[in-house]
Amino acid sequence: IGSYDFMAPEVYKGMPYDQTADIYSLGMVLYYLANDFKLPFSEIQSSIDRINRRMNGDTEWDWKQKLSSWGIATNIKQKMSEEILYDTVMTACANDPKARYQSATAMKQDLMICMDKICTWEKRKDNWEAAKKK
């Protein structure tokens, strides 16, 4: 049992699927968390209409363009210290299973790089804040 909003397009369409469907779902969870608990096309009330909108004719590039035009992608990038997290989420959420990470290990590697960069940035920020107080 799953939520349509987090369901990979091939699962929703009743087509054969593999491990990349889980990667898609995880990507949607990360998108949701990084975007103030909003999903793509969150202005649409019906989750079925939202998933249909994501799937109908949108390539990954078009999806990024639409997100940017609505100010969502900019918001995500502001909340993410490094663009690699944005790219990781978009790769995980690709409509085409072949364009997604092919394993959780591959996705984990990019997430670990991102975490390392975020932690380094946070440490620098804390040091800068402490120095400002002196």
Please report, for each region that a protein language model flagged, where it lies by residue:
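Structural helix C-cap motif within protein kinase domains
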Residues: 35-39
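Conserved C-terminal C-lobe helix
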Residues: 79-93
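Conserved HRD-motif arginine in the catalytic loop of eukaryotic-like protein kinases
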Residues: 100
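Conserved activation segment of eukaryotic-like protein kinases, specifically the C-terminal portion
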Residues: 1-10
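Regulatory extensions appended to serine/threonine kinase catalytic cores
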Residues: 119-134
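Conserved end of the kinase activation segment
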Residues: 11-19
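Conserved catalytic-loop aspartate of Hanks-type protein kinases
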Residues: 22
